């Protein structure tokens, strides 16, 4: 979503659709129906960012309402720290100046640590893996063309949950 000047509602609609498709499989592997899968975390964050970036205050209340509604549903998807990390990622991708990048980078790192705050070693490992991935991808990313097709992540996520659901039911 950060590649474009603004978040497109058509992209979000597709993401909401895949989140619904994946939710069925998410329930099959044992999560309660009210626990949203990670695609919902992406969709909620993207929708809120789209609404608050509109020039009118008209969308502020729905954005706040969506965030509040997501809180009890987000326990299986990194909670509000996940939303904070995704928001910090979006802001970091849009940063124009070094001070902005530094500030949003620190915020992003804190959010990654908070996503696994129940275990310090998991928090540090999560941050280390994320930073290593960023370093590798940023140094090789300009030379490598897109490997997977568009929408691969959301399709793969939904299909892998379905496969896990089938395995669990055997």
Regions found by a protein language model. Give the residues of each.
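Alpha-helical transmembrane segments and their immediate juxtamembrane cytosolic regions
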Residues: 1-170
């Amino acid at each position: 979503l950060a590649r474009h000047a603004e978040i497109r509602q058509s992209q979000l609609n597709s993401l909401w659709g895949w989140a619904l498709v994946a939710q069925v499989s998410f329930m099959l592997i044992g999560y309660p129906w009210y626990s949203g899968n990670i695609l919902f975390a992406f969709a909620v964050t993207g929708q809120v960012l789209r609404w608050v970036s509109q020039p009118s205050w008209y969308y502020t209340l729905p954005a706040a309402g969506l965030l509040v509604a997501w809180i009890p549903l987000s326990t299986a998807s990194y909670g509000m720290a996940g939303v904070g990390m995704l928001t910090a990622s979006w802001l970091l991708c849009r940063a124009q100046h070094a001070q902005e990048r530094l500030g949003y980078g620190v915020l992003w790192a804190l959010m990654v640590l908070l996503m696994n705050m129940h275990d310090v070693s998991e928090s540090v490992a999560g941050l280390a893996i994320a930073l290593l991935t960023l370093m590798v991808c940023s140094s090789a990313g300009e030379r490598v063309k897109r490997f997977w097709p568009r929408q691969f992540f959301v399709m793969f996520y939904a299909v892998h949950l379905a496969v896990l659901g089938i395995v669990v039911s055997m």
